UniProtKB/Swiss-Prot annotation:
NAD(+) binds at residues 274-288. Its cofactor is FAD. It is found in: Cytoplasm. This is tRNA uridine 5-carboxymethylaminomethyl modification enzyme MnmG. FAD binds at residues 13-18. One of its GO terms (molecular function) is flavin adenine dinucleotide binding. GO terms for biological process: tRNA methylation; tRNA wobble uridine modification. Homodimer. Heterotetramer of two MnmE and two MnmG subunits.
Length: 656
């Protein structure tokens, strides 16, 4: 049956990538259909009950700055909030929250059901409708055909998923949900390059059987309580709960080693590669054999359940081994396991077959986002989903794709890494992956992206109004600190000594004083009995006031470093944005080695910047490529047509 309504964009899958994709597409005015195998699992946290962390929290803030749902849903469902690396520099500080699974899922579903231009439909997708080199719709398991001009595929771990517990295995997309076997087979028919990856999850524990008196308590931050969204307030948070800490020991490790002969990972049953930075407990005791103990965090799953998530013991060992290893740890001697841990293998598709817009190079209008691209993590999925949904909507509206740069957003780093380097293992975001991380901080994600989001149609009036007030207040206050002066005559020596350690000997602006180590914004604003404070309130809301003060302080203290990084970005811009002609044959570039020309012809980079980051492409090869392009440009000056970048980059002649 052909469904009577035609849509602009169809999103397949209702996880973290799919929900952000559907919301983004609908926000910018595209008529969007979200197809999911089960409406009850929209926004489900399939693995750990947490959002954020180092690098990951940066992505969540960027999704929020672009109008996405993840941060706001976390503020409404978070039962513990912490700032990681709070004693370190602002570039690596990151927000992390424990979330109540039920509340988080409800917050996401509420947004989906109340988003204009968005329709939901419950049916698994078995096939894509493809005409020539473009996608035109999707077909469900009972044969309903939905037509659309673009499709965003966010299938997570469901593509030909296989669940392993010991040497037992069965098909499944996650515990309790069926795998997407037919859809996986259809994608293989389309000759898209694919492989297998693996991830895992730990056994869940009944909190009533845990002896908390033997554990170390880990509370969240309370003064102040962090928020995730730039529009968030601490009052939105539900009741806050602590996490708890225990440790593995030598007996635990002996139990694990004794079960490796029945481990699907160590007997070759699992062929997929697992995540390096979220290893199973089997991997940990094998890779870090000299380590006597590993820290395990017991994380509450919610306010209305006794279930705990033991972060750090992801495993696919047989259940009897899981039971024994859990009981070997302090506080868990009598623990009751509610759900066994398991590993899951699934299909992914080589992201080097994607454009930077996340559209497939082979099939027009088909976009991929999330674990199908070889990433791991809710946050990485949500960020890709937002970008894919946005660009699917722009594709339908016949507008140029928006592709964030590496110097613009962690989202830009994520996508550029995927489409230029591919993945050999599940990809996870870290701050260390960003070369411009001082400019890509959590605190300035809105300053970097909200204006762009407004232009793209992603940011509503409420967010825009709050952002505009913050932006203007930061600018005014920064200028005030630069233009407000204190002198030895106007600043009493005892007051200067209390703040600076000694009296001042000449005139200083408040900004100059603030640049000194250990001096805070509140400190300089309190000088002269508070006379140096702002004449007018910076903001009505305490959260917004805190954001403004933070922005002003960081901007002034790190001004020199930030300007130096901006100059470096400007120097690199020419190569980064120079687009390569679609039809170029790299075998014709004089001096390129066979290996380099083969890689460039295979992966078809869109810009010189992308080409420079492909493994094996040397700086010398880039120089040869630039010479080749300049020669052709000189030879085509007289009226030759030229191809320009979609984002305003340099002009490179097209090849004829």
């Amino acid at each position: 049956m052909l469904f009577p309504t035609e849509f602009d964009v169809i999103v397949v899958g209702g996880g973290h990538a799919g929900t952000e994709a559907a919301l983004a597409s609908a926000r910018m005015g595209a008529k969007t259909l979200l197809l999911t195998h089960n409406i009850e699992t929209l926004g489900q946290m399939s693995c750990n009950p947490s959002i954020g962390g180092i690098g990951k929290g940066h992505l969540v803030k960027e999704v929020d700055a672009l109008g996405g749902a993840m941060a706001a849903a976390t503020d409404e469902s978070g039962i513990q909030f912490r700032i990681l690396n709070s004693s370190k520099g602002p570039a690596v500080r990151a927000t992390r929250a424990q979330a109540d699974r039920i509340l988080y899922k409800a917050a996401i579903r509420h947004r989906l059901e109340n988003q204009p231009n968005l329709w939901l439909f419950q049916q698994a997708v078995d096939d894509l409708m493809v005409e020539g080199d473009r996608v035109v719709g999707a077909v469900t398991q009972i044969g309903i055909r939905f037509r659309a001009r673009a499709v965003v595929l966010t299938a997570g771990t469901f593509l030909d998923g296989k669940i392993h517990v010991g040497l037992n295995n069965y098909t499944g997309g996650r515990a309790g949900d069926p795998a997407a076997v037919s859809l996986s087979a259809r994608l293989k028919e389309l000759k898209l390059p694919q492989g297998r990856l693996k991830t895992g999850t730990p056994p869940r524990i009944d909190g009533r059987s845990i002896d908390f008196s033997k554990l170390d308590e880990q509370p969240g931050d309370l003064d102040p309580i962090p928020v995730f969204s730039f529009l968030g307030r601490a009052e939105q948070h539900p009741q806050q709960l602590p996490c708890w800490v225990t440790h593995t020991n030598e007996r635990t490790h002996d139990i694990i080693r004794g079960g490796l002969d029945r481990s699907p990972m160590y007997t070759g049953v699992i062929e997929g590669v697992g995540p390096r930075y979220c290893p199973s407990i089997e991997d940990k005791i094998h890779r870090f054999a000299s380590k006597e103990s590993h820290q395990i965090f017991l994380e509450p799953e919610g306010l209305t359940t006794n279930e705990f998530y033991p972060n750090g013991i992801s495993t696919s060992l047989p259940f009897d081994v899981q039971l024994e290893l859990v009981h070997s740890m302090r506080g868990l001697e009598n623990a009751h396991i509610l759900r066994p841990g398991y590993a899951i293998e699934y299909d992914y598709f080589d992201p080097r077959a994607l454009k930077a817009s996340l559209e497939t190079k082979a099939i027009n209008g088909l976009f991929f986002a999330g674990q199908i691209n070889g990433t791991t993590g809710y946050e990485e999925a949500a960020a890709q989903g937002l970008l894919a949904g946005l660009n699917a909507g722009r594709y339908v509206q016949e507008k140029d794709a928006w592709c964030p740069r590496r110097d613009q957003a962690y989202l830009g780093v994520l996508v550029d890494d995927l489409v230029t380097r591919g993945v050999a293992e599940p990809y996870r975001m870290f701050t260390s992956r960003a070369e411009y991380r001082l400019s890509l901080r959590e605190d300035n994600a809105d300053m970097r992206l909200t204006e762009i989001g407004r232009e793209l149609g992603l940011v509503d009036d409420v967010r825009w109004d709050a952002f505009s007030r913050k932006r203007d207040a930061v600018s005014r206050e920064t200028e005030r600190l630069k233009s407000t002066w204190v002198t030895p005559k106007t600043l009493p020596p005892e007051e200067a000594t209390a703040l600076l350690g000694k009296p001042i000997d000449h005139e200083y602006s408040l900004a100059e004083l603030l640049r000194r180590p250990g001096i805070s914004y509140d400190g300089v604003c309190g000088l002269k009995g508070g006379e140096c404070g702002p004449v007018e309130p910076l903001a009505d809301e305490p959260v917004l006031l805190g954001q403004i003060k933070e922005q002003v302080e960081i901007g002034i203290k790190y001004q020199g470093y930030i300007e130096r990084q901006a100059n470096e970005i400007e120097r690199n811009d020419a190569n980064e944005n120079t687009r390569l002609p679609d039809g170029i044959d790299y075998r014709e570039v004089r001096g390129l080695s066979f290996e380099v020309s083969q890689k460039l012809n295979e992966f078809r980079p869109e810009t010189i910047g992308q080409a420079s980051r492909i493994s094996g492409v040397t700086p010398a090869a880039i120089s040869l490529l630039m010479v080749h392009l300049k020669r052709r440009g000189l030879g085509r000056r007289n009226g030759a047509a030229a191809e320009t970048t979609e984002q305003g980059g340099d002009t490179v002649p097209t090849q004829q």
